[in-house]
């Protein structure tokens, strides 16, 4: 794991709050020149510490009014087949996040959909095309309201 210093940590915390922060804004927070900040940000990107930048959007403007958490209990959580399962799922457009975790359900997927029918179609598709015999159970929860996303308070 790459080592970072206190200044890098401040830059990372500021960028996690606002990925569009300018070099000038960051330089004021840290006390370095914008050129020095630029060098540090580029170094953090090159090292893979900064993995990318994205906007937090209201998916309803894309016609996606429903967000669901899909939890999957794997038949064999230690199977080498897991990476083969996850790679094609990551390419599906509605999927926003995928987590491997401890507990009763080893995979959690956060995805957005137009409606319940499109969610049901998606569940049929992943069961049929991806999960096959790898899933013991699937549990779905619908998000009713989102208060914070990507570190940004939405209230």
Swiss-Prot record:
One Pfam family named in its UniProt record: HTH_24
GO biological process, one term: response to amino acid
Native organism taxonomy: Archaea, Methanobacteriati, Methanobacteriota, Thermococci, Thermococcales
InterPro entries named in the record: ArsR-like_HTH, AsnC-type_HTH_dom, Dimeric_a/b-barrel, Tscrpt_reg_AsnC-like, Tscrpt_reg_AsnC/Lrp_C, Tscrpt_reg_HTH_AsnC-type_CS, WH-like_DNA-bd_sf, WH_DNA-bd_sf
Name assigned to this protein: Uncharacterized HTH-type transcriptional regulator PF0054
UniProt DNA-binding region: 23-42
Membrane-spanning residues: none
Keyword vocabulary terms for this entry: DNA-binding, Transcription, Transcription regulation
Keyword match tRNA processing: no
Molecular function in Gene Ontology: sequence-specific DNA binding
Domain HTH asnC-type: 4-65
Gene Ontology CC: cytosol
Superkingdom of origin: Archaea
CDD domains xref list: HTH_ARSR
Keyword Lipid biosynthesis among record annotations: no
């Amino acid at each position: 794991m790459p080592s970072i210093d206190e200044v890098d940590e401040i830059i990372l915390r500021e960028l996690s709050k606002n990925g569009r922060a300018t070099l000038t804004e960051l330089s004021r927070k840290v006390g370095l020149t914008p050129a020095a900040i630029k060098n540090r940000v580029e170094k953090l990107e090159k090292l893979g510490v900064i993995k990318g930048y994205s906007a937090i959007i209201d998916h309803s403007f894309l016609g996606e009014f429903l967000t669901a958490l899909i939890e999957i209990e794997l038949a064999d959580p230690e199977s080498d087949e897991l990476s083969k399962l996850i790679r094609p799922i990551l390419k599906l457009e509605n999927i926003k996040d995928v987590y491997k975790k401890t507990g009763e359900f080893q995979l959690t997927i956060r995805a957005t959909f137009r409606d319940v029918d499109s969610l049901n179609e998606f569940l049929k598709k992943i069961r049929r095309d991806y999960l096959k015999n790898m899933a013991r159970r699937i549990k779905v929860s619908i998000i009713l309201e989102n208060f914070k996303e990507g570190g940004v308070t939405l209230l």
